[in-house]
Each structure stands twice: as C-alpha cells, then as structure tokens.
C-alpha cells in the first residue's frame, strides 16, 4: 500500500542519515556491510547532459526528445508535487515544487496526496518546465524511491529534475564510495552522420540515447 504524505514527511526526517551513510561506506570495515545499498540491482540512474555542444555547432538542450518516448510509452504517469531532495535539504537555489515524474504501472499506485496523475501532454509540459528551470534530468530506478512512496520497485521508473546542491545521487558521487559510481551512467546524445553533415545540431529523428556514456 502506498504511503500517505504525512508518512513520507516523517521518513524524510531521516534524510541527513543518507550523507552519513555515504561517508561511512568509504571506510574499509563498513564498505562490505553497506555495499548492497549501492548495487545496480537496487539503484540505477542515467544523467542526461543539458546544453552541451553537439556536432560542433551550437549548444542545445537535448533531453526533451530523448525523454519524450519514455513519457509517451509509459502505462501511467504521476507528477510528485515536490522534489524529495530539495524539500529535505531546504533548497534555496531551485524550486522544490518541480518534483519527480514517475512512470509505469506503479505510478498509478502512488498516494494522490503526493501529487497528481498526468496525461502525456501534462507530463511533457512538466519535463519542459524542469529544463527551463535549469535542472538536470536523470532517469532513475531506485529502490529508495519505491520504499519511501510504498510502491512496487520493479514496476516503476522516475525522471528526476536534479540540482547539484541537493540531489542525493550527486552527493553520493561526491561523498560516497567507489561502488556508487557503478549505479550511475552518463547519457550521451549521438546524431546520425547525415545530420552532422547538414549542420543540424539536434532533432528527435536523429537523436538516440547512448547509455554507455
């Protein structure tokens, strides 16, 4: 059963323990104990670069055409009212009200107190809003998200809109153990040769996601 907004708020009080765990996991005698929490089977993320130079031409925002198929093909979509990371950290640099977009069957089971179901057009508008706010989109399949919301882990996927100051994944990359890097990949936009020759920076028909970074 999915968790109520009040329960999620209570669980978020434990948020500071996450940073402590990142640091403890770097200690040799604790790394073996905490390593299961950093396995790809429990947590996977792909960070999609924003505003990077493509094909030697102008700098463009690529994520939208890469993320749109995920949104369009999902069986259900749910927009969370507030970013868990920015809410827990008290972010002052970016809007906390731009929350994660959950996709898949489990998204339909999120407690409506946490946000709202979304149509394809509403979900795509939310993605665009996150990009315009300067947030970095990250495709995440994290057991923590499923646990805190009380939804099935294997039936969900999330598109998070991350800031460098509060994102728990980015904090883990900076402060966590080497094993944390195994759970995160850097997406890369790759264009077909004919588009490069034509000087086209980016467009949906020629843009594909290369998860190998």
Regions found by a protein language model. Name each.
Residues 162:
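Conserved hydrophobic/aromatic pocket- or pore-lining residues that grip, position, or stack substrates
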Residues 167:
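Short functional micro-motifs and their immediate structural scaffolds
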Residues 1-142, 147-159, 175-213:
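Iron-sulfur (Fe-S) cluster-binding modules
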Residues 170-172:
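Short Cys/His-rich "knuckle" micro-motifs
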């Amino acid at each position: 059963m999915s968790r109520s907004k009040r329960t999620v708020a209570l669980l978020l009080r434990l948020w500071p323990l996450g940073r402590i765990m990142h640091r403890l996991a770097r200690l040799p005698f604790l790394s073996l104990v905490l390593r299961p929490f950093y396995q790809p089977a429990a947590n996977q993320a792909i960070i999609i670069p924003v505003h990077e130079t493509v094909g030697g031409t102008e700098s463009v925002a690529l994520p939208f055409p890469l993320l749109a198929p995920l949104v369009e093909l999902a069986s259900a979509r749910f927009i969370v009212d507030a970013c868990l990371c920015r809410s827990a950290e008290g972010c002052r640099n970016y809007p906390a009200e731009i929350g994660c977009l959950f996709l898949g069957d489990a998204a339909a089971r999120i407690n409506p107190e946490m946000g709202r179901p979304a149509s394809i057009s509403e979900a795509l508008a939310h993605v665009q809003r996150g990009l315009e706010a300067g947030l970095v989109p990250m495709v995440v399949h994290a057991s923590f998200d499923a646990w805190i919301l009380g939804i099935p882990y294997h039936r969900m996927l999330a598109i998070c809109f991350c800031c460098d100051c509060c994102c728990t994944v980015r904090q883990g990359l900076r402060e966590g153990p080497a094993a944390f890097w195994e759970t995160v990949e850097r997406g890369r936009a790759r264009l077909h040769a004919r588009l490069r020759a034509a000087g086209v920076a980016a467009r949906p028909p020629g843009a594909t996601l290369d998860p190998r970074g």
